[in-house]
């Protein structure tokens, strides 16, 4: 599915501070997002999509265990996001330190 295919759909956005991740993605493609609904919870978004209130773009990680009756389609261009690890250096266990080295 391309962003232009979704441009006329009503979106349910995941709030992250003052901006979501979908709006900038559309903006970079020269498109606008139509949205009236937003929430802080991925599962609430999936429930709203299941109820026919709109569509959304969610991380593949959360969709792997999706138990809602919704269609899951890959997005063209494979957009990605950066995820960071934040930790207190004084409290890192040996196992956690090894994991961070691996990253």
Residue ranges and their predicted role:
Residues 16, 60-62, 89:
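Short secondary-structure boundary segments
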Residues 1-3, 9-10, 80-85:
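Small-molecule pocket liners
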Residues 9-29, 93-97:
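Secondary-structure junction motif
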Residues 4, 46-47, 97:
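Alpha-helical segments flanking ligand/cofactor-binding loops in enzyme cores
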Residues 24, 28, 42-70:
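A ligand-binding cleft/hinge motif common to bilobed small-molecule-binding domains
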Residues 71-103:
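A late-sequence structural motif
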Residues 13-15, 32-41:
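Short beta-strand-to-loop elements that line the ligand-binding cleft
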